Amino acid sequence: MKHYNTKKLNREKDSWLYEISNSIVEPKKLLKFLHLEKYPKYYDSKPKKVFPFRVPYSFASRMKKNDPKDPLLLQVITKNQEFLNNLQFNEDPVKEKKDIVLPGLLHKYKDRVLWILKTNCAINCRYCFRKHFPYEKNKGNKKNWIQILHYISQNIELNEVILSGGDPLMAKDHELLWLITSLSKIKHIKRLRIHTRLPIVIPNRITSDLCQIFSNSVLKIIIVTHINHPQEINEQLSDSLLKLKKSNVILLNQSVLLKNINDNAIILAELSSRLCENNIIPYYLHILDKVKGTSHFLVSNKKAKSIISDLMKMISGFLVPRLVFDNGSKDNKLIII
């Protein structure tokens, strides 16, 4: 990965790039940072050869020291369980490959497309459902972007574009300005939805320039954050989320239900409360997509339903996310509750 000269970086604009370039890329280094050198049984470095290991320090700093069961650590640490063979788990659990119409563009639903804007992330979560996605054939470059814009302009039934990845906010501000300006010239496009985890792990990604881009856009901008545990929300993130709110951005959140991480109603109630405090609507709670190497994260449908049932007794209805599952064979996500 390219390392940036910090003397040349604009402190406000580019500090997030510095954080990415200086991320922790070795499991042992993260364990040392957390004073967990004596717990080698809790990780296996081999899985990082299949799916790279990457954790920014700003996210690692929210993990509890001396706690091998920290819920943030468990989302990112490599384990030999990733090599467990389970026939129910495969490399394309939501059957996305069949929906690729152009390099980087998926057209599954009639009125919207999903754009793989960038192929990398600031953090590599071990449960990621795209850990085996064919990114090499779907790279985010200007040539592909121009083809995608043409496709969108020619399909007038579309009214929404979803930016995904990787993480779409890995694109720099000037790239996003060009893209959003280009989309705003297509009259039938009304909404731009951005699915991202980057501001959660590196809050500095929400720059003043980015907020200005969102604020000036004629498109309705919706950002879907990926927050799984209340411990992920700190003061710095709250400040960045407030900037987005002031930029007329609609904020939603989706979480993944993860075994031994957030699979109880008390944690999810606290998460929904913290989200509400930060102007985010709890949107979806996903049953784990059965991607190869993630079976140790799976929470059964029966337990998931029980958790939601308990959650509904604890908090206001609007704070209860919809429990959903996507197996790729339906025209939409299956809403369980």
From Swiss-Prot:
The modification N6-(pyridoxal phosphate)lysine is found at K333. Its EC number is 5.4.3.-. Binds 1 [4Fe-4S] cluster. The cluster is coordinated with 3 cysteines and an exchangeable S-adenosyl-L-methionine. Keywords: 4Fe-4S, Iron, Iron-sulfur, Isomerase, Metal-binding, Pyridoxal phosphate, S-adenosyl-L-methionine. Residues 107-322 form the Radical SAM core domain. The keyword Metal-binding applies. Belongs to the radical SAM superfamily. KamA family. With EpmA is involved in the beta-lysylation step of the post-translational modification of translation elongation factor P (EF-P) on 'Lys-34'. EpmB appears to act before EpmA. Displays lysine 2,3-aminomutase activity, producing (R)-beta-lysine from (S)-alpha-lysine (L-lysine). This is L-lysine 2,3-aminomutase.
